[in-house]
């Protein structure tokens, strides 16, 4: 890589099982010759790791998640920073931000930036934030303190739950921002005059980790009680994933259909969803696996007949971008049914390479599920078309090379 600089990548948490797309990108950047150090705002909460995490060589540097957890570390950082001009330069925008957002969270982000500035990773000469909400706040303050430029990857929740004034200011300060869905891209472009600094780049998939499935998906059609159709979903048990809608849709399926549903993923709503499944009389047909690593998830894609995800826009505006699990399932020729939310129609076209239904509508979702359960030929057609699209358009190497090019073009401008 020409003009290479050590990049400090600021992440909300690391490693996280639900963020394989970030780990895959980090590994891709390393393999392209970039020198990284990872700066995480919190320690991992997942007991398991994906194989990709073990392949990333970058050192991980943890900031205090809460300032009161490590008061001496924060105090030392403050004492070290007070004599430096960068601290006072960053104080001005921070005070302005506090005037518009008087929250503990705001003070925490400035404190974390202070620790990053005081304990600066050796030789880091560029900052890159993953997520435009809290990680970008820490990065923006640290950038001013250290006099080091920054860039940003924006995703989904971070875009849709942030105030427009804050997004506009961050887009103006970052050298460039990249995002992973057209809906997010258009929204961010509408908030800045620097439209050429906002870029669209789909994460794509490391297709070596998701090689073509050489076997065949089954001809199950829901008529055999001893061999039910297998429906799979992978995703965190959180509101935006719409698992309550999916369970209600399953409860509306005709009594003569034989199926089983498996869920993979952890999350705050797991207990509530299990209770709902019992209340709807679905418990005997539902398996809750919790979080699994990538190898086990791949095996479940291959053993299943249908992949279902009922994404929605949550009450607070949170929503998915383009859920990576839909790309993964499609790579295994698994017929997918999902909703018309955010970036999902950028992957799935209804009746062409998947079924796409309106969000928040269990009846329409149930009708789509019934079609797929009863018709293995339809599943094969949709699954084959979905795989062709993923392998042609969603290879993560193109995303990594685009990012690499963006970094290098900035470095040529400011040697």
Where are the language model's segments positioned?
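Acidic donor-binding loop of glycosyltransferase active sites
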Residues: 302-317, 334
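Short hydrophobic beta-strand element within catalytic cores of glycosyltransferases
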Residues: 326, 331, 335-338, 348
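Conserved acidic donor-binding segment of nucleotide-sugar-dependent glycosyltransferases
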Residues: 347-351, 355-362, 371-377
